[in-house]
Amino acid sequence: MAAAVGRLLRASVARGVSAIPWGISATAALRPAACGRTSLTNLLCSGSSQAKLFSTSSSYHAPAVTQHAPYFKGTAVVNGEFKDLSLDDFKGKYLVLFFYPLDFTFVCPTEIVAFSDKANEFHDVNCEVVAVSVDSHFSHLAWINTPRKNGGLGHMNIALLSDLTKQISRDYGVLLEGSGLALRGLFIIDPNGVIKHLSVNDLPVGRSVEETLRLVKAFQYVETHGEVCPANWTPDSPTIKPNPAASKEYFQKVNQ
């Protein structure tokens, strides 16, 4: 009887392994391929256009700039503790919500650490930063507790939100349905919950924290002063009065 049960269990496990995404065995997922990469490395390094499993087919529509951000709610790791987090928690503040593919990967920790290290500069302009992936909050915490020299995150000054059901990634239009990973989507949401900026990178390329902070400051400047920000604007550079006559002041200044 025990032998029969054992055979059934082994057969069940074998069927489960054969259904693993990427179409490989569990051990093969961690074993270097002939080219010197793991299969997961291939996914994250080759980009979505290189793999058939990166299907973006979905019945959901990606949100657009000027539209209200889709509502979200989930469990996050905040200051080393589990905490419920939702879009409502950021009313009256700017929010940078950025998605990344997976914990314990390669480009992702560089982005998250960079945003965390700049958290105070975002706070100075009334802006919070939240990172999101399809991993569990337990995985987030384990990654935070891993030293940075070993590819971990270490102490975090930003929240890491779990999207284990993938619904948040799907609602924001960044989920790759075939692989179940999120593209590197970044959304700047204003204090009224309106999307002011969005960008989406393919998996192998990280984002600029400095550019994100510059954009937040630019949107805030426009709201406060009623003038518009030209290319490469920084807080100490001139802006443009948005009408034909007054705008000449700017163009004459920069084209002397």
From Swiss-Prot:
PROSITE patterns registered for this protein in UniProt: THIOREDOXIN_2
Which Gene Ontology cellular-component terms appear in the entry?
Answer: cytosol; early endosome; mitochondrion
Q: Share an example GO biological-process annotation for this protein.
A: hydrogen peroxide catabolic process
Q: What is this protein called?
A: Thioredoxin-dependent peroxide reductase, mitochondrial
User: PANTHER family per the record?
Assistant: THIOREDOXIN PEROXIDASE (PTHR10681), THIOREDOXIN-DEPENDENT PEROXIDE REDUCTASE, MITOCHONDRIAL (PTHR10681:SF128)
Cellular localisation: Mitochondrion; Cytoplasm; Early endosome
- Highest taxon listed in the record's lineage: Eukaryota
Q: What is the lineage of its organism?
A: Eukaryota, Metazoa, Chordata, Craniata, Vertebrata
Task: Report whether Mitochondrion shows up as a keyword of the record.
Answer: yes
What positions are modified (N6-acetyllysine)? K91
- Gene Ontology MF terms: thioredoxin peroxidase activity
Subunit and partners: Homodimer; disulfide-linked, upon oxidation. 6 homodimers assemble to form a ring-like dodecamer. Interacts with NEK6. Interacts with LRRK2. Interacts with MAP3K13. Interacts with RPS6KC1 (via PX domain).
PTM note says: Phosphorylated by LRRK2; phosphorylation reduces perodixase activity.
Q: What EC number(s) does this enzyme carry? A: 1.11.1.24
Q: Which residues form the Thioredoxin domain?
A: 63-221
**Modification N6-succinyllysine occurs at:** K83, K91
Task: Give the EC class as a word.
Answer: oxidoreductase
